[in-house]
Amino acid sequence: MVRKMAEETNCQGIHIVKILFLDMDGVVNKGRDNASPNRYRYNDKWSNPSDRFDLYYVDPELAARVSALVTDFDLRIISTSTWRCGKTVDEFKELLNNRFLPGDRLIGFTPDGESEGMSRADEIRYFLLHCEEDIERYVILDDEKKANYCTPKGRFFQTSFYKGYTEKVDTRIREYLENR
């Protein structure tokens, strides 16, 4: 288990300055989007063609806000989302790029420890323990409190499942990153 998780972090040999631990549902989409006709589409290899439902729906406005944050602060992305499960880093980069997000900034995943009873905070902690010497600081962006893991190097910012990544949360993160 430990070896498998170390391989999943994909952090060996990467010199990182700042990290965004990024969840997807409740961050780049909103709970009410589940009923949106925009969630249905007709030709996407990430969705099951038989049900024509986009399992990876992204609100373009929220994605633009995340993209601007990543670009403005030169952040690298580590995915904590369940969307990462069963995908390679390259496949997930393509998924992000196809959804208005900077896939080129994705450098890896937290390990999937859910089957071992790990919370998202535990997965983030595991990642940080195995890559700490390379990380200057980090931000965790998630709609669930179970991802809350703060240290002197980083901070958790919670979004709302129903509102996603709002301007208010964006302002708080920007103030945090500017004052470090």
Residue ranges and their predicted role:
Residues M1-L22, R32:
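Non-catalytic pre-domain segments flanking phosphatase-related domains
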Residues E7, A64, R125-F127:
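A generic local structural motif
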Residues N10-G13, D74, N179:
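Short, flexible coil/linker elements and helix-boundary hinge sites characteristic
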Residues H15-I16, W83-K87, F161-Y165:
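Short, exposed beta-strand "edge-strand" segments with a Pro/Gly-rich flavor and a Y/T-containing core
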Residues I16-K18, F73-L75, D134-R137, G154:
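Short coil/turn segments at beta-strand junctions that form active-site/ligand-binding loops
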Residues I19-E114:
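Alpha-helical substrate-recognition element adjacent to the catalytic core
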Residues D90-R180:
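C-terminal cap/substrate-recognition subdomain and adjoining C-terminal extension
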